């Protein structure tokens, strides 16, 4: 089995393309596994500025077929040309897969370097895949190791010690744009009830903002504010809240967004400036709202450009931890695969021995002589297996365990089987999309 990943991020392509690629992401892994024998496991990591697919294929020769199957699935779901989809992804295999994911989980590859939110997103991606039954055992170990690496980076370095995140940088920008930087006097409207909305609520309160309203077309706003505070909005109260707001923050990423024309109508006659912070990859707010009088629009690109740089020492320490963890993961993975091969060879050899001993007993009975023959044969088999076992570990230490596995298949017809799917997660995950929102403003996903 071989791990691979398809990676599309803010570092290589524009966020609009990343958003388009992520359309239908929640069903991609399931359809890929059912549609291609080359895909034995898949975990999808979709965030505000990246869309990545981590997969497991039976053999290195199957990676290209697995990639083609995933590209075709994405093209079908998004309506994008297959060639465009293919060009948008960088393909990683072998040690590059763990090196990249560990860096991502640790915040080293984020628009805001060192941010901690991505670690939670990596954990949730695995939980989702386990719930859907698409996480192979190899992928489970990969993502668990990534989460552990992120914890080690947080505990052993100063990376992220300032608590920066995409949300915090966005709110800092909003403070700079405000005529009055005092958040205790501001009214905020938050669109969405997911993880970003929760982080936004917490950071707003840290800054002193107490007048926070939350809108969810799915009816989840009441439950959301019940545990976090704030006021739940519905389709009737949303327009008035937006009209009076100093800040509105989009955290949902639905198919429908706040249109400039509707916002202009709702805000007509307002003398105060509205800061619109769009943290959704697929845009909660029409980009044209930034052209309206009295509206300042902040986007993910604004955050990326404004994000402060981490200190070089912290980055070097974190990078060292990531590199070491990735190397250890690859060594453990190689040892695990060759262990399965050794067990398979021993099982095959002992099955042959047992079959021959059955013939001996059938002819001579369970005599002392038969026992002596069995003892001698088992000792001989043990000696014969010694060199192949040593060679297996030598090859694994050099990353050549696949050659050993291929040799077993070629010489003895032994197929080294490894589990393809991990058990489902214990906690359920809601993958549903929200319903329709009021025509006044928008629809959102909780």
Curated annotation (Swiss-Prot):
Record bears the keyword NADP: yes
Binding site for substrate: 47-50, 110, 115-117, 121
Catalytic activity: (S)-4-amino-5-oxopentanoate + tRNA(Glu) + NADP(+) = L-glutamyl-tRNA(Glu) + NADPH + H(+)
InterPro entries, A to Z: 4pyrrol_synth_GluRdtase, 4pyrrol_synth_GluRdtase_dimer, 4pyrrol_synth_GluRdtase_N, GluRdtase_CS, GluRdtase_dimer_dom_sf, GluRdtase_N_sf, NAD(P)-bd_dom_sf, Shikm_DH/Glu-tRNA_Rdtase
Positions bound to NADP(+): 192-197
UniProt record similarity statement: Belongs to the glutamyl-tRNA reductase family.
GO MF, one annotated term: NADP binding
Gene designation per UniProt: hemA
Function: Catalyzes the NADPH-dependent reduction of glutamyl-tRNA(Glu) to glutamate 1-semialdehyde (GSA).
Residue ranges crossing the lipid bilayer per the database entry: none
Coiled coil: none
Site location (Important for activity): 100
Note: During catalysis, the active site Cys acts as a nucleophile attacking the alpha-carbonyl group of tRNA-bound glutamate with the formation of a thioester intermediate between enzyme and glutamate, and the concomitant release of tRNA(Glu). The thioester intermediate is finally reduced by direct hydride transfer from NADPH, to form the product GSA.
Gene3D superfamilies: Glutamyl-tRNA reductase, N-terminal domain, NAD(P)-binding Rossmann-like Domain
Positions annotated as active site in the UniProt record: 48 (nucleophile)
Family annotation (Pfam families): GlutR_dimer, GlutR_N, Shikimate_DH
Name of protein: Glutamyl-tRNA reductase
Organism whose genome encodes this protein: Arthrobacter sp. (strain FB24)
Keywords from the UniProt entry: NADP, Oxidoreductase, Porphyrin biosynthesis
GO terms (BP aspect): protoporphyrinogen IX biosynthetic process from glutamate
């Amino acid at each position: 089995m071989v791990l691979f990943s398809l990676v599309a991020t803010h570092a290589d392509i524009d966020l609009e393309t990343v958003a388009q690629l992520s359309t239908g992401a929640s069903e991609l892994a399931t359809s890929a596994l059912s549609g291609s024998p080359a895909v034995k496991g898949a975990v999808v990591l979709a965030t505000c500025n990246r869309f990545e697919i981590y997969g497991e294929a039976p053999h290195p020769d199957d990676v290209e077929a697995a990639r083609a199957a995933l590209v075709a699935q994405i093209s079908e779901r998004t309506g994008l040309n297959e060639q465009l989809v293919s060009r948008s992804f960088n393909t990683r295999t072998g040690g590059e897969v763990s090196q990249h994911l560990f860096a991502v989980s640790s915040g080293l590859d984020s628009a805001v370097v060192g941010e901690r939110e991505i670690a939670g997103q990596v954990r949730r991606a695995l939980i989702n895949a386990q719930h859907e039954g698409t996480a192979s055992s190899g992928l489970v170990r990969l993502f668990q190791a990534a989460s552990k690496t992120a914890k080690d980076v947080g505990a052993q370095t100063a990376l992220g010690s300032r608590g920066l995140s995409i949300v915090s940088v966005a709110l800092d920008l909003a403070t700079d744009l405000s005529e009055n930087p005092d958040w205790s006097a501001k009214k905020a409207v938050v669109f969405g009830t997911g993880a970003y909305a929760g982080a936004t609520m917490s950071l707003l309160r840290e800054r002193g903002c107490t007048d926070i309203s939350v809108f969810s077309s799915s009816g989840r706003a009441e439950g959301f504010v019940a545990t976090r505070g704030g006021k739940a909005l519905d389709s009737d109260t949303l327009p008035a809240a937006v009209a009076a707001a100093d800040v509105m923050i989009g955290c949902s990423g639905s198919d429908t967004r706040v249109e400039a024309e509707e916002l202009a109508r709702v805000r007509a006659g307002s003398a105060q400036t509205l800061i619109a912070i769009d943290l959704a990859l697929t845009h909660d707010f029409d980009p044209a709202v930034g052209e309206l009088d009295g509206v300042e629009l902040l986007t993910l690109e604004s955050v990326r450009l404004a994000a402060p740089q981490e200190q070089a020492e912290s980055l070097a320490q974190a990078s060292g931890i990531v590199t070491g963890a990735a190397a250890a993961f690859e060594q453990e993975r190689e040892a695990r695969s060759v262990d399965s091969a050794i067990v398979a060879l021993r099982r095959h050899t002992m099955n042959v021995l047992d079959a021959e001993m059955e013939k001996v007993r059938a002819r001579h009975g369970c005599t002392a002589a038969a026992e002596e023959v069995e003892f001698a044969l088992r000792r001989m088999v043990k000696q014969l297996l010694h060199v192949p076992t040593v060679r297996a570990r030598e090859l694994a230490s050099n990353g050549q365990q696949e050659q050993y596995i291929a040799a077993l298949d070629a010489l003895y017809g032994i197929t080294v089987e490894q589990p393809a799917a991990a058990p489902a997660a214990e906690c359920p995950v809601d993958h549903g999309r929200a319903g329709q929102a009021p025509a006044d403003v928008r629809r959102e996903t909780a």
